[in-house]
Amino acid sequence: MAKRQLNRRQNWRIEKIQGERAARAAKREQHALQELEGGDLGPEQLGLVIAHFGVQVEVEAQDGEGAGQVFRCHLRANLPALVTGDRVVWRAGNQGIGVIVAQMPRSTELCRPNNHGQLKPVAANVDLIVIVFAPAPEPHPNLIDRYLVAAEHAGLRPLLLLNKADLINDENGPGLHALLEVYRELGYPLLEVSAHQGDGMQRLQQQLDGHISVFVGQSGVGKSSLVNSLLPDAGTRVGDLSEWSGQGTHTTTTARLYHFPNGGDLIDSPGIREFGLGHVSRDDVEDGFIEFRDLFGTCRFRDCKHDREPGCALLKALDEGRIKPQRMNSYRSIIASLTEDSY
């Protein structure tokens, strides 16, 4: 059934109602915060944001008598937007409720624009981005390449992870192996695992130990199943593929941080069906295609668009097989979408 189109007045009314609801929620939260700060608060201490629930977050105490315990905390109004992985300064209050009073500097942050084009951080202090894909839903090179550009832009090390390797068959196998070979030749670390059968999970765990990682990828690729296999006590709900679309159903509604027994953390984030790059420049995209780097600036014309121009270094490399058509198509698609991407 076609999606019903709303006119301008209907859209305005919906936005007005949503704005009023948000204002009422913020007012209730501010009242609760004032009551909390009016009581006795404990000393300032360090904490780690392990989950975010709208106007409140869960903070794990990092020092003091309550180290390792989790507290629900309110946010002071003057704080910037906090995300899972943030290190903060907080004070404990009554009944296990606390107040975050400051945000510590971030070493890295993974951001994406919201529907209004404003940058929104989705995870902080991460050093490894695990790009998850699977035989179904069908993996799209363009989406993988967008994640690789985002990783390069954020200064994160990427790990490509093919989950559900047990679903590889004679029909989808040739295409999948050709896809993987492109990234292997470029030197990207790549693992094939099956969270369902356990194949390759030990090698994955070794790659994650000692790092703060985030899983990204389409819904339905098995991110929650991977978390359940790596951390059986996490209890992350698993969703099936939607029968009518072949796309995954969302199961994780907020980013949550989990600890590994041997050190390191994992942030499980909601499924992202399309990863836009409206917040990066053309130069950032070019940096994200590592095999293109030495070619930029060597074309005959300084303003070469790498389309049909004579003397184009990229087109020459494409003809000679030094650039794969799959990657060239992704590059062109991403460049063309820079001014119109939305999430």
From Swiss-Prot:
User: Does the UniProt entry include the keyword rRNA-binding?
Assistant: yes
The cofactor binding remark recorded in the entry reads: Binds 1 zinc ion per subunit.
Pfam families listed in its UniProt record: RsgA_GTPase
Question: Which segments constitute the CP-type G domain?
Answer: 116-275
What does the UniProt record say this protein does? One of several proteins that assist in the late maturation steps of the functional core of the 30S ribosomal subunit. Helps release RbfA from mature subunits. May play a role in the assembly of ribosomal proteins into the subunit. Circularly permuted GTPase that catalyzes slow GTP hydrolysis, GTPase activity is stimulated by the 30S ribosomal subunit.
Protein's GO biological process: ribosomal small subunit biogenesis
Subunit structure comment from the entry = Monomer. Associates with 30S ribosomal subunit, binds 16S rRNA.
Q: Which family does it belong to?
A: Belongs to the TRAFAC class YlqF/YawG GTPase family. RsgA subfamily.
The organism is Pseudomonas putida (strain GB-1)
Q: Where in the cell is it found?
A: Cytoplasm
What cofactor does this protein call for?
A: Zn(2+)
Which residues does the annotation say bind GTP? 163-166, 217-225
Provide the GO MF annotations for this entry.
Answer: GTP binding; GTPase activity; metal ion binding; rRNA binding
Q: Which PANTHER family match?
A: SMALL RIBOSOMAL SUBUNIT BIOGENESIS GTPASE RSGA, SMALL RIBOSOMAL SUBUNIT BIOGENESIS GTPASE RSGA 1, MITOCHONDRIAL-RELATED
- Keywords carried by this UniProt record: Cytoplasm, GTP-binding, Hydrolase, Metal-binding, Nucleotide-binding, Ribosome biogenesis, RNA-binding, rRNA-binding, Zinc
Q: What is this protein called?
A: Small ribosomal subunit biogenesis GTPase RsgA
UniProt key word Cytoplasm: yes
Residues binding Zn(2+) are: 299, 304, 306, 312
Q: What is its EC number?
A: 3.6.1.-
A single cellular component GO annotation: cytoplasm
Q: Which domain of life is it from?
A: Bacteria
